[in-house]
């Protein structure tokens, strides 16, 4: 068959050196996350399909956990897990699938809906990246690519089928997926379908996490037309549906209702009736805790999440150094539906994103340029049910639109015979958000620069300066109505949202330096040794947080009001009366990352270390949601070359005692041991079969990751069988 340079480039990026390599491929190249097809492009950290099959992870965050300073946030439910990169997560990390942004974000719920079976590879950029992707990239970028027929066809075959069955013991997870694919000189097509079904999750020492069962199913269709050597078009459509019964806050273990909190208040004010007095916290301490618990109210709900995306790509790659063009048109739609189990109250959040990306690169004699324009329009529609019982005090539904236009430029300037490489970049974004009554608009300039010094053929240094920003989300702009409330002691206690017209975007300024040593044939012919060390410091200004407080007209002395009971001063308040999104924190995130790998024809040894410290620059107080430092060591060995490989990894998570003053919990250290094996012959009668086995948390440790609200997964045996023909 005859494929264009573009098609061949896509196919060759899949080649990996080791069937079970857990370490990052530091010298592989791809253009999804970096948006840069030039030969000087920055290399992101990458997880190949081979590595993903070996790990059998159930979420993107779990698949990336062995990368220094990339951790899991969101608890043990796979749907709620999100990557935490250098202390930042959620809507401070940009998610990209097939070159298209995924903007759905609802607090304490999932936003990574692509199943692992539909992921061909994952790339990670750590650190601010708004010069590439605009708003939101304070912590970094996670970019995923789904497969096409050219990825799966072997040996110039024109037709193929791939069948996979996976099983995991921790939650009786069954994963089934089937792909059918074909290609000729002009056309290629892929159709994939999957079905995943899991029971409640088992944690360490045999405990069960209630309400963690789920089902997920869906599919992917891709069509490609190679018009000629210079022109190619692709059309893809992806659709998934996720179902579970869980607390509306997917990050907590069990539901917490208004009624439960009200019972606690009544118990606190219950008279002794002649009994010996019990030790109680002060009323100030008690109601401070009540405020926190009301902010975490979460009812058990039936949840459904339909998610779909349609993308049209056009590639123009003539034999012209000035033209290497990519145009993408896309439409994403995500709907999050919830219905409370007891009362039947329904909620719905629907986000539709339409956009276009245009990118071109030009190679001049002494300079390389990448430049482009992005436009996207987000439309959000929400519904919030109410009743006179468990849903009396709810946030109001809101409908809003957002338009964002970004223009960016990346340059690579080699100097002194390419011993130095200067790579400045800049992006300008203009955005506006509007509802029926309010409209906001703003703009932001995001510069970045990188200087690489190739000292010798085995040593190079890189220094970076990157800026990023995150515009306030539509929820932060437009949420209104009641945050929480209750009827207690003969009165309604209601906390209401207050709009903030002066809300500013979050901004980040990151400095980092990296040293990279790499040797070939160091100890024996053909071996490779790599070691990389990075130090970074990211100063984030105007963090947006939800502030809960009393207004100036309200008596903040809850003691007097509580003591008065039903006859309390009507201007008093047991609970804070206002909630508002405010810019309240200037933070500094700093840390180090170390990676080392030694590889021979059959043996791979690797180790990595990551540590992030976060503090409020004004008060010096520790920040929340900073993962514990971790160090991992591992080995892979091909017992039978090109056929059977075994491996092991041991990871030590340090204790996390750096927590905010009002966070009463610290987290002890723990060690996890994982084993794995892969049977994947490259030739012979079983060359179409691949078997992966993994045993995670070998010693069934009971542990709780830092700032997680639930325990981690216990011993988990995983097996996966793939057969292709």
Curated annotation (Swiss-Prot):
- What GO molecular function annotations does the UniProt record carry, in alphabetical order? heme transmembrane transporter activity; siderophore uptake transmembrane transporter activity
Q: TBDR beta-barrel domain spans which residues?
A: 158-725
InterPro entries hit by this protein:
Plug_dom, Plug_dom_sf, TonB-dep_rcpt-like, TonB-dep_rcpt_b-brl, TonB_haem/Hb_rcpt, TonB_Hb/transfer/lactofer_rcpt, TonB_rcpt_b-brl_sf, TonB_rcpt_CS
May I have one GO cellular component term? cell outer membrane
Location of the TBDR plug domain: 36-147
**Cellular location(s):** Cell outer membrane
From the record, which residues define motif TonB C-terminal box?
708-725
Using the UniProt record, give the first listed, main subcellular location: membrane
What family does the database annotate? Belongs to the TonB-dependent receptor family.
Its function, per the record, reads: Required for utilization of free heme at low concentrations.
What is the protein name stated in its UniProt record? Answer: Heme/hemopexin utilization protein C
- Source organism of this protein record: Haemophilus influenzae
């Amino acid at each position: 068959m005859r494929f264009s340079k573009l098609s061949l480039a896509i196919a060759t990026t899949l080649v990996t050196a080791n069937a079970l390599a857990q370490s990052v491929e530091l010298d592989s190249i791809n253009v999804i996350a970096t948006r840069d097809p030039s030969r000087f492009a920055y290399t992101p950290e990458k997880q190949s399909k081979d590595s993903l099959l070996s790990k059998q992870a159930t979420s993107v965050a779990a698949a990336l956990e062995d990368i220094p300073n990339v951790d899991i946030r969101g608890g043990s439910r796979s749907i709620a897990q999100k990557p935490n990169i250098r202390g930042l997560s959620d809507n401070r990390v940009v998610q990209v699938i097939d070159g298209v942004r995924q903007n759905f974000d609802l607090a304490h719920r999932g936003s990574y809906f692509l199943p692992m079976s539909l992921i061909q590879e994952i790339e990670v950029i750590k650190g601010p990246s708004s010069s590439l992707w605009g708003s939101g990239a304070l912590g970094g970028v996670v970019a995923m690519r789904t497969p096409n027929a050219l990825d799966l066809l072997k040996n110039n075959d024109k037709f193929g089928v791939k069948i996979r069955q996976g099983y995991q013991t921790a939650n009786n997870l069954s994963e089934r997926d089937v792909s059918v694919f074909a290609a000729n000189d002009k056309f290629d097509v892929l159709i994939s379908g999957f079905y995943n079904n899991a029971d409640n999750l088992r944690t360490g020492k045999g405990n069960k996490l209630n309400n963690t069962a789920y089902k997920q199913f869906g599919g992917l269709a891709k069509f490609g037309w190679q018009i000629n050597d210079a022109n190619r078009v692709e059309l893809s459509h992806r659709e998934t549906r996720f179902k579970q019964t869980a607390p509306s806050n997917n990050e907590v273990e069990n539901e917490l209702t208004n009624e439960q909190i009200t019972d606690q208040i009544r118990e606190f004010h219950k008279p002794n009736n002649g009994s010996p007095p019990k030790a109680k916290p002060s009323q100030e301490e008690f109601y401070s805790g009540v405020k926190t618990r009301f902010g975490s109210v979460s009812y058990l709900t039936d949840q459904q999440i339909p998610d779909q995306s349609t993308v049209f790509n056009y590639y123009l790659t003539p034999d012209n150094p000035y033209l290497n063009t990519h145009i993408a048109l896309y439409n994403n739609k995500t709907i999050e539906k919830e219905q409370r189990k007891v009362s039947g109250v329904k909620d719905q959040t629907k986000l539709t994103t339409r956009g276009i990306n245009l990118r071109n690169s030009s190679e001049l004699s002494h300079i390389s340029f990448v430049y482009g324009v992005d436009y996207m329009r987000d439309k959000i529609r929400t519904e919030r049910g109410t009743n006179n019982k468990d849903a009396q005090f709810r946030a109001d539904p809101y409908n809003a639109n957002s338009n964002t236009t970004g223009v960016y430029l990346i340059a690579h300037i080699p100097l002194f015979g390419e011993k130095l490489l200067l790579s400045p970049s800049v992006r300008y974004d203009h955005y506006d958000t509007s509802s029926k009554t309010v409209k906001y608009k703003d703009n932001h300039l995001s510069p970045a620069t990188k200087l690489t010094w190739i000292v010798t053929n085995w040593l190079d240094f890189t220094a970076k300066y990157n800026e990023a920003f995150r515009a306030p989300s539509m929820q932060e702009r437009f949420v209104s109505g009641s945050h929480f409330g209750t009827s207690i002691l003969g009165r309604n206690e209601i906390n209401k949202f207050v709009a903030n017209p002066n809300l500013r975007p979050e901004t980040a300024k990151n400095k980092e330096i990296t040293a990279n040593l790499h040797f070939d044939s160091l100890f024996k012919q053909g071996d490779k040794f790599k070691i990389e060390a990075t130090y970074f410091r990211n100063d984030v200004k105007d963090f947006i947080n939800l502030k809960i407080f009393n207004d100036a007209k309200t008596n903040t002395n809850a003691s007097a009001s509580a003591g008065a009971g039903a006859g309390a001063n009507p201007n008093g308040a047991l609970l804070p009366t206002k909630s508002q999104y405010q810019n309240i924190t200037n933070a500094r995130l700093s840390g180090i990352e170390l990676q080392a790998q030694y590889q021979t024809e059959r043996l791979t040894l690797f180790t990595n270390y990551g540590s992030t410290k976060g503090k409020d620059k004004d008060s010096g107080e520790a920040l929340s949601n900073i993962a514990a430092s971790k160090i991992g060591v591992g080995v892979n060995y091909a017992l039978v070359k090109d056929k059977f490989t075994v491996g092991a990894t041991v990871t030590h998570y340090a204790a996390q005692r750096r927590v905010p003053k009002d966070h009463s919990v610290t987290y002890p250290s723990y060690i996890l041991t994982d084993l794995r094996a892969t049977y994947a012959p490259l030739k012979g009668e079983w060359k179409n079969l691949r078997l992966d086995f993994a045993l995670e948390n070998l010693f069934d440790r009971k542990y709780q990751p830092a700032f997680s609200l639930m325990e981690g997964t216990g011993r988990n045996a995983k097996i996966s069988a793939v057969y292709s023909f």
